[in-house]
């Protein structure tokens, strides 16, 4: 989450005329994240999250995201629910941007997830995949393997400003992934961005999964690979196989991996590392002046990629085969 677009009091009041939420009590921008403009909105009826969708989110995909949230919530997943307007719609416009209001979930993120937290995350991800299995909507992954060279091309000449030799590293990894990307794995709705800052905890239990604005149809095991990179490395960069084993074990207890999925995890993890390294690199060079946002260091994910390049067997990552 972040704030790229400011909202005036007058614009907000006019926008809220479409809802039955009462008068505004407070609006506070959220600096975390990098994609959309997000605010904690307090009104006479409660606390909500207001999101203005920025350029990386396709406006045509917004009905998919909001319908998915309704679907998952109806199946018992703790996720935000879109707040309906008086017209029964969930999507409007504010400050020149598409905008929506969703329910606020109580809880805090784990900055340093424990092994037990990784197990809970694995179970929650499996529950998400199973709950979404009968969702009728579909959306292609706009940041899949085919998109990565296009992300890289406009910034390739600047990559070595971040680290010497980075451009060559990226080019070589793209060639490897294009030649070795697994095919014909089980597919379905994935979250595609399930970092620790998108999972809320109350005590020892997960109280909510948030920020579904990269959700799409892709390999289910690719979602696991994204989580592996986001949850199972220590702050200093070392991989924690116990966290990996806890996550994979809890996931597989609800949705067992096929042999092909398990074998593919190392390559999928390399792809996931490159995907987030590239989008962070793009954002590093393109922070709008005055935006309330904290761009994330792309080198964190290049370091993870470097480690993953040494893995020859999924069991080295904690996958149970």
UniProtKB/Swiss-Prot annotation:
The reaction(s) this protein catalyses: L-homoserine + ATP = O-phospho-L-homoserine + ADP + H(+)
UniProt organism field: Methylocella silvestris (strain DSM 15510 / CIP 108128 / LMG 27833 / NCIMB 13906 / BL2)
Name this polypeptide is given: Homoserine kinase
Gene: thrB
Enzyme class: transferase
Keyword check for Transcription regulation: no
Pathway(s): Amino-acid biosynthesis; L-threonine biosynthesis; L-threonine from L-aspartate: step 4/5
Highest taxon, organism lineage: Bacteria
E.C. code: 2.7.1.39
Gene Ontology biological process terms, A to Z: threonine biosynthetic process
Lineage: Bacteria, Pseudomonadati, Pseudomonadota, Alphaproteobacteria, Hyphomicrobiales
Annotated NCBIfam families: PRK05231.1, thrB_alt
Gene3D superfamilies in the cross-refs: 3.90.1200.10, Phosphorylase Kinase, domain 1
Molecular function (Gene Ontology), one example: homoserine kinase activity
Family: Belongs to the pseudomonas-type ThrB family.
UniProt-listed PANTHER family: AMINOGLYCOSIDE PHOSPHOTRANSFERASE DOMAIN-CONTAINING PROTEIN, AMINOGLYCOSIDE PHOSPHOTRANSFERASE DOMAIN-CONTAINING PROTEIN-RELATED
UniProt KW keywords: Amino-acid biosynthesis, ATP-binding, Kinase, Nucleotide-binding, Threonine biosynthesis, Transferase
Keyword ATP-binding included in the entry's annotation: yes
């Amino acid at each position: 989450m972040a704030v790229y677009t400011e909202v005036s009091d007058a614009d907000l009041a006019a926008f809220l005329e479409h809802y039955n939420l009462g008068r505004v009590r407070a609006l506070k921008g959220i600096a975390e994240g990098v994609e959309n403009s997000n605010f904690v909105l307090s009104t006479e009826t409660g606390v909500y999250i207001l999101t203005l969708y920025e350029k990386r989110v396709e406006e045509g995909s917004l009905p998919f995201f909001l319908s998915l949230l309704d679907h998952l919530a109806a199946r018992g997943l703790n996720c935000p629910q879109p707040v309906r307007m008086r017209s029964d719609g969930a999507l409007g416009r504010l400050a020149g941007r598409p905008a929506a209001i969703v329910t606020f979930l109580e809880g805090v993120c784990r900055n340093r997830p424990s092994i037990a937290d990784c197990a809970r995350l694995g179970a929650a991800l499996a529950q998400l995949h199973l709950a979404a299995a009968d969702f009728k909507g579909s959306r292609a992954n706009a940041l899949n393997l085919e998109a990565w060279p296009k992300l890289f091309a406009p910034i390739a000449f600047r990559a070595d400003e971040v680290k010497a030799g980075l451009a060559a590293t990226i080019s070589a990894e793209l060639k490897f992934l294009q030649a070795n990307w697994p095919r014909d794995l089980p597919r379905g709705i994935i979250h595609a961005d399930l970092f620790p800052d998108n999972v809320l905890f109350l005590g020892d239990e997960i109280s909510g999964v948030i920020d579904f604005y990269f959700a799409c149809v892709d390999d289910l095991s690719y979602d696991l690979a994204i989580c592996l990179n986001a949850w199972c490395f220590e702050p200093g960069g070392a991989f924690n196989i116990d966290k990996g084993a806890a996550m994979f074990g809890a996931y597989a207890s609800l949705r067992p991996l096929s042999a092909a999925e398990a074998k593919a995890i190392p390559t999928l993890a390399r792809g996931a590392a490159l995907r987030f390294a590239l989008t962070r690199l793009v954002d590093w060079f393109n922070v709008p002046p005055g935006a309330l946002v904290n761009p994330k260091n792309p080198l964190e994910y290049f370091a993870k990629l470097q480690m993953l390049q040494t893995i020859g067997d999924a069991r080295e990552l904690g996958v149970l085969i």
